[in-house]
Amino acid sequence: RDARTVSPTEGCSVDEATEVLRNIARIHSRFWNDHRVPSIGDIAESVERWGPPANHGWIALAERYGSKAGDALAQFEWVKDNTLAWVEHRAGSPQTLAHGEFQPENVLFTNEPTGKNVLIDWQFGGAGPGICDVAMFIISSLTVEERRTHEDSLLKTYHDVLTADGTFDYSFEEMFFDYRAAAAMTLFKALLKAGWTATPGSRSDIFEISDALFERTLAAAQDLAPVEALKEAMARNRA
């Protein structure tokens, strides 16, 4: 009864983020490489579906934020032009039950001392890399300063819970590389949100949401070089 959601602009506290990551880590661990989890479907169909929104979003993003982005704008453009790359990477990475839209609005937070939280809105749930959920949540839920300060400890908490039962081998170093590559998906999400600012009938706070997400993903692009990591991951997969 005391559960609440938070807005994308407000985000959540670091302590709340820690407990959310513990929660999703337990889910990811439970369904790690579980073939019963439905896949995302045909790759070509996914690319065809996401291409037009990406192009629409790119026009809006470049116009609204181009002067702020500097050299990092090229990473957003690359993500727009290479939908196939990140869809293939998503399909070829270690699979688990991924939420697919893991942002603060899709978590019910409580005031319980245990930090209990409930993950909601699983309409995009299915087989995918769990680290994509993690990257989306950390980057979109925390301020730039909070992420930079606490990113490493949050990732270690997630990794410790994920691998606690020792049933699969996934080193922290491997996971951090995957986290960098997965951050490219947050750039794509920023494209989509920017596109909604140029779409009639969008929610009234879409400009504030888009501005906040762009600021956070821009910093992530500068800090993590996600496109570079994604390119390296694709080269490994195709070798």
Description of each model-found segment:
Residues T167-A183:
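All-alpha amphipathic helical-bundle segments outside canonical DNA-binding/catalytic cores
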Residues F124-G166, A183-S204, R216:
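Active-site activation/catalytic loop segments of kinase-like enzymes and analogous catalytic loops
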Residues M185-A239:
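ATP/Mg2+ or Mg2+-diphosphate-binding catalytic cores
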Residues E105-N106:
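Conserved protein-kinase catalytic-loop position immediately C-terminal to the HRD catalytic Asp
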Residues R1-A3, Q75, G128, C132-D133:
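Active-site-adjacent bridging/hinge elements
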Residues E101, D121:
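Conserved catalytic-loop position in the HRD/HxD motif
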Residues R4-H99, F109-P113, A212, Q222, ...:
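ATP-dependent phospho-/nucleotidyl transfer catalytic cores
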